[in-house]
Amino acid sequence: FPLLNLRMLHYPPERRVNTEDGRIGCGAHTDYGSITLLSDDGVGGLQVKPREGDWVDISIPEDHLVVNLADLLSIWTNNRYVSNPHRVMNPANTHRYSIPLFVTPPYHLKIETLPTCLAPGETPKHKPMISGEYLQSRFDGTHTYRNELMDDAL
């Protein structure tokens, strides 16, 4: 069974990091698993980076979801479907709320390019990996403060 992680996120208006476009609520990243379903409160702030060009504001119509493709789906499809970089630029003086549902393969599952996503003679662009090991490495890389806290605890 896939792992499902439902989060309820609050981006307060008083963020310290400013840019010309607004306030960073969540820096640029790709999601780790296979897909993410996202609902928000209509305030705005979600941006996606196309392969070429600048960040694009995404408006989610009421009663609709955004579907983000994530890293492990890219591996399965040999980059036919690529995880999309995105970020949140929280509008100034506004609270922002969103509810993402992260869908991830089971922790022990071997992730490798599907044969149907390879053209004749094509080789996979990614090495096979275990889902949970990949997720843990991405989590550790994103949340480096955890390692610092553990070092201080010892």
Segment roles from a protein language model:
Residues 1-154:
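C-terminal flanking tails of non-heme Fe-dependent oxygenases
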